[in-house]
UniProtKB/Swiss-Prot annotation:
ATP binds at G24, P25, S26, G27, V28, G29, K30, S31. Its EC number is 2.7.4.8. Residues 17-197 form the Guanylate kinase-like domain. Keywords: ATP-binding, Cytoplasm, Kinase, Nucleotide-binding, Transferase. HAMAP family: Guanylate_kinase (MF_00328). It comes from the Bacteria. It catalyses: GMP + ATP = GDP + ADP. CDD domains: GMPK (cd00071). The gene is gmk. This is Guanylate kinase. Belongs to the guanylate kinase family.
Length: 197
C-alpha cells in the first residue's frame, strides 16, 4: 500500500469528485439550476453536448451546445465519440466522450445535463456515476413552464409533455431525486452531490 504524506489521509472513494448526471423532464429547470450552481462554483465542469437542434436566441456554439449537422452527428456516433446520445423532439443530442473522461481522470467533478435515454446509457457504461432526477413541484407547474417558454410550436410542446410523463415514471431508476421548488436550494443540493463541498 502506498504511503501518504504525514498529516494527510487518502481521500475515501465516496468523497472524490465523480460523474454526476442530472436528468428530468423538459421544462423542469435543469439548465437554470446548473447555470446557478456553476455561477457560484465554476470548478464543476459541465459537459457541452452536441446537438442537431437549431440554436435558440442567445445560444452560442461551443458554449451552450456544439451545433452540428445530421451528417456530423452520424460520424460522431459511428466513431464511438459520444458517451451517450439520444433523440428528443426530432433532434439528436450527445455527450462527447473524450472531454468527460479526461476531466474525471484529472479528479475534477463532472456534471452531465442529459435526458432519460442518455442517463440510462451512462448508467450502463459507467455504473459508478450518480444519477440525479430533477422533478417539478407538480404536473401543472411543469405544463406552465413548458407553455410559458413561447419558443416552440404547440405540437412540439405536446411531444415534450408526452415525453415528460415517461420521464417522470422513470424516477425510481435514479439514485437521488431533487424537487425544483427553489433554484438556489436545488443548486446547493446538487453541488453537495458532486462531492465538491
Amino acid at each position: 500500500m502506498a504511503a501518504t504524506p504525514r498529516g494527510t489521509s487518502p481521500v475515501p472513494p465516496d468523497a472524490r469528485p465523480r460523474l454526476t448526471v442530472l436528468s428530468g423532464p423538459s421544462g423542469v429547470g435543469k439548465s437554470t439550476v446548473v447555470a446557478h450552481m456553476r455561477k457560484e462554483h465554476p470548478e464543476v465542469w459541465l459537459s457541452v453536448s452536441a446537438t442537431t437542434r437549431r440554436p435558440r436566441p442567445g445560444e452560442q456554439h461551443g458554449v451552450h451546445y456544439f451545433f452540428v449537422s445530421d451528417e456530423e452527428m452520424d460520424k460522431l456516433i459511428a466513431n464511438g465519440e459520444l458517451l451517450e446520445w439520444a433523440e428528443f423532439a426530432g433532434n439528436r443530442y450527445g455527450t462527447p466522450r473524450t472531454a468527460v473522461l479526461e476531466r474525471l481522470e484529472a479528479g475534477e467533478p463532472v456534471l452531465l445535463e442529459i435526458d432519460l435515454q442518455g442517463a440510462r446509457q451512462v448508467r450502463e457504461s459507467m455504473p459508478e456515476a450518480r444519477l440525479v432526477f430533477l422533478a417539478p413541484p407538480s404536473w401543472d407547474e411543469l405544463v406552465r413552464r413548458l407553455t410559458g417558454r413561447g419558443t416552440e410550436p404547440p405540437e412540439v410542446i405536446e411531444r415534450r409533455l408526452a415525453a415528460a410523463k415517461v420521464e417522470l415514471a422513470a424516477e425510481p431508476e435514479f439514485d437521488q431525486t431533487l424537487v425544483n421548488t427553489s433554484v438556489e436550494d436545488v443548486a446547493r443540493e446538487l453541488l453537495a452531490l458532486t462531492n465538491v463541498v
